[in-house]
């Protein structure tokens, strides 16, 4: 490796003060609003170098990983108590190894589901809760009534449970898989949250205290699995009963998957800098954030097509979003939208050069993705993409009309449009196109089914909670918080708490959709869940997507850039 490459490889970030935003001819001659986004902190020379200089996994590590996989498969087949089997599944999943042991995990969970009547988990809070969570995660329905045994005569959870921190933590995590109307689980969530908050600082076992603090910050069901795996590998290493075989395999596999992701990042970065979209002063330059989101949705190496096309469509989508939000006039946006509806370039010469560039990038990339899908999957997806883009741009157009007309819609009207304008119907449809069984299956996503409706609505509301202050400062469209304030006269604090409550309720509906949506199977159900988890990652503490130099860069660097040290072997 030469010195210039070495320099690039050691500098994933750039100094934003060194960045020069290029302006187009229309920027220079017209008074347009600007997004006021800070320049990307990611060094695109470094990102491009990952295509050829990603973390190479040594041959000896590949051989060791295969050996360890065999040992873990033996663990799954060995005689053990049901609770021990559940705990093995839980650790394997949290370490990010479930993609290696899908068959073994299903066999364990189906076996435990069938044997549920023997009652080995009765009166054991941790066992009951873990069994409930893992089986529901797998799509196997367990009723909330299994927790009735922990209630007292008045129907409330017994105070004796407060002494069982491990059991309370399992109950807390299980409660987030509840459905709307499952009051026992609602009570369990409130009960466990209250007592874990009061107890965690006094927990003597450091590993358990760390898990409790982590869970209270955000429950496992709402976390991105790939990011969680990176955190859990480090946390698991500190546990007294840590299994060294699982830990070693988790580290090796994490680095092996990361190497695959890095090669993809490098290739995508090379494409992105050729588009010219990274030079637009008013728009976000967020390729790596888009990749992180695609990785949140579908990190398994076998979903390469889904990941790459989500990034390509998503990166262009972000710029289109910014064009509607802050750049285009209403007349220009109407012309842009009508051109999308016709899927035609005939009228775009009437647009300013910047919007022509954006339209052609959207048009060409979508058609390229369609051709790739035709080649790799054997069916024509372009009509599906066109429908999704039309729906997308019409939602942007409506928000622009609200803004330019000074109109604040009621929350319900805003939400129905906002669940489309957030962009996740388009991105999830992109992911679905990459895994669909055949061309006929593409009809399932139009009109928007409940699974996509509620996952997209959740992402919209979570986005609004995190981005409202920044977007209002930029002069962007109103958000759900402000619609609710205008509709009800509530304060911002009350409105924010209301939207948080709506998020919790819609998570319950989405949980149920995962069982009700018989027309969709895995992995698309998990794609939808993971898209919402990605929203929690990027927006839980602010705008971690639009503001690149935020708390998210630490996790992104640890997941996408830095391999886990393997230590002595």
Swiss-Prot record:
InterPro entries on file: Isoprenoid_synthase_dom_sf, Terpene_cyclase-like_1_C, Terpene_cyclase_plant_C1, Terpene_synth_N, Terpene_synth_N_sf, Terpene_synthase-like, Terpene_synthase_metal-bd, Terpenoid_cyclase/PrenylTrfase
UniProt GO molecular function: magnesium ion binding; terpene synthase activity
Sites where the protein binds (2E)-geranyl diphosphate: 284, 321, 325, 460, 463
Origin: domain of life: Eukaryota
GO biological process, one term: diterpenoid biosynthetic process
UniProt keyword list: Lyase, Magnesium, Manganese, Metal-binding
Residues noted as binding Mg(2+) 2 in the record, renumbered to the chain: 321, 325
Binding residue positions for Mg(2+) 3: 463, 467, 471
Cofactor binding notes: Binds 3 Mg(2+) or Mn(2+) ions per subunit.
Gene3D superfamilies found in the cross-reference section: Farnesyl Diphosphate Synthase, Terpene synthase, N-terminal domain
Annotated residues for binding of Mg(2+) 1: 321, 325
Motif (DDXXD motif): 321-325
Pfam families: Terpene_synth (PF01397), Terpene_synth_C (PF03936)
Keyword Magnesium (UniProt): yes
Summary of the function given for this chain in its UniProt record: Catalyzes the formation of santalene.
PANTHER family in alphabetical order: (-)-ALPHA-TERPINEOL SYNTHASE-LIKE, OS04G0344100 PROTEIN-RELATED
Recorded domain comment: The Asp-Asp-Xaa-Xaa-Asp/Glu (DDXXD/E) motif is important for the catalytic activity, presumably through binding to Mg(2+).
Protein name: Probable santalene synthase
Species in which this protein is naturally found: Santalum murrayanum
Gene of this entry: SSY
